[in-house]
């Protein structure tokens, strides 16, 4: 039986939500992952270190008994964020990064940044103290096509920001385009990118061909096949600038299966099985540990995990539930549209 042992992975972009949903989904992450960067776009958002501390305590209380899991907290950047509070959060060890959502870019992002000049004092302080900025890299202006938002963000927002603050460490989260891959590769320093599980597997046909498939709808939206292939090449290359951030984002089914459905795909439960399939397809199983377990910690200045997990390839396909039941309601699990034979032993 084929097997692969690697250091326990981390998830560098995760939505856990709160309340009953948090309690219903956290076990799917804590079973396999040692750490995760937790997104702050709650309602209301996590905007201060006090908010982050309280949210962290709720997460810790929800972790299933026996699981060892560390939530890495972030702050939601607004035009009113206080630089001293951000610095204190970093000094205390509570805050791992600050998250930039352009206003209106994704779920619960309406309080995000509209005028970057108002956020510059905080960004300048972050550059000074070495605190990374995680960016949702899309513009939201109505004249830009949704499939072009990432390229437009690089050209009109990110590159000018990095020219102005070259010492600011920036993570381009959930990149979805060849443009994003090439931009990161062209950088000499202070730029890296996370890649989701689902963007390695689906292109925009998955959402639109044969009827609208709401459970493949996410933001940033999946792009053309050429972009998916560029992401796969980057993820499986071993390049230290690319690492796993699942962007696993649970929504109850009624909020997905409606006239104006929410963006988000739930992948925490089967991510490692999906990744092993993808990396085996690319003859790159030897690069999976770098992508899932090594590159992310190195970028964020943390040691890799000492614990290991073992993936085993089984003859029979591994059965994952079509849905998970949470106290908030049912959540549909990502279906990669191929049988999964790799299993976490």
From Swiss-Prot:
Enzyme class, UniProt record, top EC level: hydrolase
Residues modified to N6-carboxylysine: 99
MF annotations from Gene Ontology: dihydroorotase activity; zinc ion binding
The record's free-text note on cofactor binding: Binds 2 Zn(2+) ions per subunit.
Pathway: Pyrimidine metabolism; UMP biosynthesis via de novo pathway; (S)-dihydroorotate from bicarbonate: step 3/3
Chain sites annotated for binding Zn(2+) 2: 99, 136, 174
Residues at which Zn(2+) 1 binds: 13, 15, 99, 247
Family classification: Belongs to the metallo-dependent hydrolases superfamily. DHOase family. Class II DHOase subfamily.
HAMAP family named among the record's database cross-references: PyrC_classII (MF_00219)
Name of the protein in its database record: Dihydroorotase
Species of origin: Agrobacterium fabrum (strain C58 / ATCC 33970)
């Amino acid at each position: 039986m084929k097997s692969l042992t690697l250091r326990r992975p981390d998830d560098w972009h995760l939505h856990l939500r709160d309340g009953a949903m948090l309690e219903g989904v956290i076990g799917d992450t804590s079973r396999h992952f040692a750490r995760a960067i937790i997104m702050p776009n709650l309602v209301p958002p996590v905007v201060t270190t006090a908010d982050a501390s309280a949210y962290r305590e709720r997460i810790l209380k929800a972790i299933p008994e026996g699981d060892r899991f560390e939530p890495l907290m972030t702050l939601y950047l607004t035009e009113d964020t206080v630089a001293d509070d951000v610095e204190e959060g970093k000094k205390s060890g509570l805050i791992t990064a600050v998250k930039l959502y352009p206003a209106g870019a994704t779920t619960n992002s309406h309080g995000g940044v509209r005028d970057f000049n108002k956020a510059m004092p905080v960004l300048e302080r972050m550059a000074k103290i070495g605190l990374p900025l995680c960016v949702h890299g899309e513009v939201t202006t109505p004249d830009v096509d949704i499939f072009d938002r990432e390229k437009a963000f690089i050209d009109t927002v990110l590159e000018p920001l990095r020219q102005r603050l070259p010492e600011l460490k920036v993570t381009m989260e959930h990149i979805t385009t060849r443009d994003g891959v090439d931009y990161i590769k062209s950088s000499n320093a202070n730029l890296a990118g996370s890649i989701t599980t689902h963007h390695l597997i689906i292109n925009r046909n998955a959402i639109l061909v044969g009827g609208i498939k709401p459970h493949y709808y996410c933001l940033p939206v999946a792009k053309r096949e050429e972009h998916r292939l560029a992401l796969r090449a980057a993820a499986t290359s071993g390049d230290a600038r690319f690492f796993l951030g699942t962007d696993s984002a649970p929504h109850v089914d009624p909020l997905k299966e409606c006239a104006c459905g929410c963006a988000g795909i739930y992948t925490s439960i089967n991510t490692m099985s999906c990744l092993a399939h993808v990396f085996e397809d690319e003859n790159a199983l030897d690069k999976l540990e770098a992508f899932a377990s090594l590159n992310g910690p190195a970028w964020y200045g943390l040691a890799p995990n000492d614990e290991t997990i073992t993936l085993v390839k089984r003859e029979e396909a591994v059965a994952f539930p079509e849905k998970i039941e949470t106290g908030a309601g049912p959540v549909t699990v990502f279906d990669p549209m191929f049988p999964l034979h790799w299993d976490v032993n």
